């Protein structure tokens, strides 16, 4: 045997040994993997999913929750019956491949099994999460059902405890309670029979009906109490009060009070129908309307009661007030008669007094009629109050008119005295002004002064003549006095101006002598001013001529003389 053959045999033997060792190692590794996969499968299979499914199933889910549960339950059934069986078969098949040293197929099978287990693990996790969510949701739903039942039971107890306070509404309330009870029964039937969607709809409606009926039950007693007790009691008191007022002699402007009482009774009776039908908004509206009508009647009665008190006070006070205004009128008439002997009065005052007297007589008739009939009132006190208040207001106006007229009459004699005093003063002023002008030794008196003086004298003479009449016309006196006052004022002003211009002109003419000898313009102005002064007696123009000429050669000279004159001017001493 050659060395080459020996080496070949050794190589082959070594290769076989190595192959065997490798096969043993691979087989062992695959067995380990398969054991691990088997263990994972068993853990998944042993999870308490069945218990969780049964727990949810026993909750009697409704609506969408039940639909969702069925979907996840079916998924779990598929997993437990099919997926786990497939995994088990695949593991068995992989073990066969591994035991027969078909390692490639075994490896492929192991990878496939691992993928299957991963998918199953993910699906189980999703199923369990979904079941947990359903459990939470069902807890809420169960609480919802229990809450609805609790509300319903409380409502039943509340109504049963005191049916009387619900009045005619109790029958309809009990009927609706029975309807809600029927809805609960229908809900249970549908939920048990596997119609969750319809059952959920019924539960929604039932909850809404419970809430609506609860609101009604809470609202009805107050409406019933108002309609059954409050409003009838008010109406009874109102009718009783009305009868007493009528017996006491009260009358009313409104003639339909009895029919309004009847209508109120009818409205109260009819409103029970709204309550019986649970038309609570209508019932509340009708209660409000009834209350407003009762208030309106109450206002009518209180108006007349208040008016009666006012009428009594007016009947007590107006006669004295009327007497007072009549006395005022008599006094005015006496004053008119007295003054008419001394003064020419306009017909307006006399007519006014006569008109007031006639009106007072008419008002007296109204007052006396109400006072005499006070023991037997024949009309509503509010109408009597209106008439007496109008009378009182008119008496106040008449009194104001009497005061105004009295002041006018009183002013006649005051105006007469004032005119007599002032006419003497003005006569004295005329004499004083005349002497004042004479003392000035002027070359002549200006026409403006003479015109004002003679006008003032004539007006003063006219005023004296009017005041000396047997019956003085005081209106003419006041007019003449106003004219004389203005005349004296104008004359006094004119006098001061004439004297001022004359004095200043004389001073400036004398002052101009210092310039006349060498200034031709001053000489000419001097001659012109002197001519106007001595021949025309226009002292203001004369002053303007000489002052303008001097201002050219000596600016400010005029104002210096004017200022000096004003400081030393002699006033007219009246």
Swiss-Prot record:
The segments annotated as topological domain Extracellular are 1-7
Q: How does it sit in the membrane?
A: Single-pass membrane protein
Q: Which residues lie on this side of the membrane: Cytoplasmic?
A: 27-574
Localization of this protein:
Cell membrane
- Listed transmembrane segments: 8-26
Q: Name one Pfam family in it.
A: EzrA
| BP term (GO), one | division septum assembly
The UniProt entry's coiled-coil ranges are 104-141, 267-424, 456-524
What the entry lists under HAMAP family is as follows: EzrA
Family per similarity comment = Belongs to the EzrA family.
> Could you tell me what this protein is called?
Septation ring formation regulator EzrA
Q: Whose protein is this, by species?
A: Streptococcus gordonii (strain Challis / ATCC 35105 / BCRC 15272 / CH1 / DL1 / V288)
């Amino acid at each position: 045997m050659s060395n080459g053959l020996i080496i070949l045999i050794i190589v082959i033997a070594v290769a076989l040994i190595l192959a065997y060792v490798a096969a043993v190692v691979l087989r062992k590794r695959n067995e380990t993997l398969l054991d691990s996969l088997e263990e994972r499968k068993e853990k998944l299979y042993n999870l308490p999913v069945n218990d969780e499914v049964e727990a949810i199933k026993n909750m009697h889910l409704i609506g969408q929750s039940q639909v969702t549960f069925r979907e996840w339950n079916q998924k779990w059934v598929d997993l437990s019956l099919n997926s786990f069986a497939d995994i088990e078969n695949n593991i068995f098949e992989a073990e066969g491949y591994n035991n027969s040293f078909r390692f490639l197929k075994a490896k492929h099978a192991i990878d496939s099994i691992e993928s299957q287990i991963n998918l199953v693990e993910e699906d189980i996790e999703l199923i369990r999460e979904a079941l947990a969510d359903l459990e939470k949701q069902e807890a809420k739903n169960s609480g919802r059902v229990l809450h609805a039942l609790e509300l319903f039971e409380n409502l039943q107890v509340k109504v049963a405890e005191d049916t009387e306070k619900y009045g005619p509404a109790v029958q309809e309330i009990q009927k609706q309670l029975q309807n809600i009870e029927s809805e609960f029964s229908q809900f249970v039937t549908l939920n048990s029979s596997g119609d969750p969607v319809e059952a959920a709809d019924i539960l929604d409606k039932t909850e809404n009906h419970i809430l609506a009926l609860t609101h009604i039950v809470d609202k009805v007693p107050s409406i019933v109490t108002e309609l059954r007790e409050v409003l009838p009691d008010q109406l009874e008191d109102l009718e009783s009060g009305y009868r007493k007022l009528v017996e006491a002699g009260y009358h009313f402007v409104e003639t339909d009070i009895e029919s309004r009482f009847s209508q109120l009774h009818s409205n109260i009776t009819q409103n029970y129908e709204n309550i019986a039908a649970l038309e609570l908004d209508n019932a509340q509206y009708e209660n409000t309307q009834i209350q407003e009508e009762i208030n309106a009647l109450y206002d009518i009665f209180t108006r007349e009661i208040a008016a009666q008190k006012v009428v009594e006070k007016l009947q007590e006070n107006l006669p004295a007030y009327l007497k007072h205004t009549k006395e005022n009128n008599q006094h005015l008439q006496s004053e008119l008669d007295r003054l008419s002997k001394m003064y020419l009065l306009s017909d307006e005052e006399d007519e006014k007094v006569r008109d007031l007297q006639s009106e007072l007589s008419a008002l007296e008739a109204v007052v006396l009629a109400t006072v005499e009939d006070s023991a037997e009132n024949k009309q509503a006190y509010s109408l009597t109050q209106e008439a007496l208040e109008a009378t009182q207001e008119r008496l106040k106006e008449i009194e104001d008119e009497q005061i105004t007229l009295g002041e006018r009459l009183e002013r006649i004699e005051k105006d007469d005295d004032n005119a007599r005093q002032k006419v003497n003063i003005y006569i004295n002023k005329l004499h004083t002004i005349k002497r004042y002008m004479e003392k000035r030794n002027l070359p002549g008196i200006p026409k403006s002064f003479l015109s004002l003086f003679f006008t003032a004298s004539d007006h003063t003479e006219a005023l004296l003549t009017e005041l000396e009449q047997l019956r003085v016309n005081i209106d003419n006196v006041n007019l003449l006095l106003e004219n004389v006052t203005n005349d004296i004022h104008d004359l006094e002003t004119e006098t001061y101006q004439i004297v001022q211009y004359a004095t200043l002109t004389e001073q400036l003419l004398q002052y101009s002598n210092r310039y006349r000898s060498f200034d031709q313009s001053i000489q000419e102005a001097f001659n012109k001013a002197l001519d106007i002064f001595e021949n025309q007696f226009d002292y203001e123009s004369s002053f303007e001529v000489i002052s303008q000429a001097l201002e050219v050669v000596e600016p400010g000279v005029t104002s210096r003389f004017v200022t000096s004159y004003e400081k030393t001017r002699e006033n007219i001493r009246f």
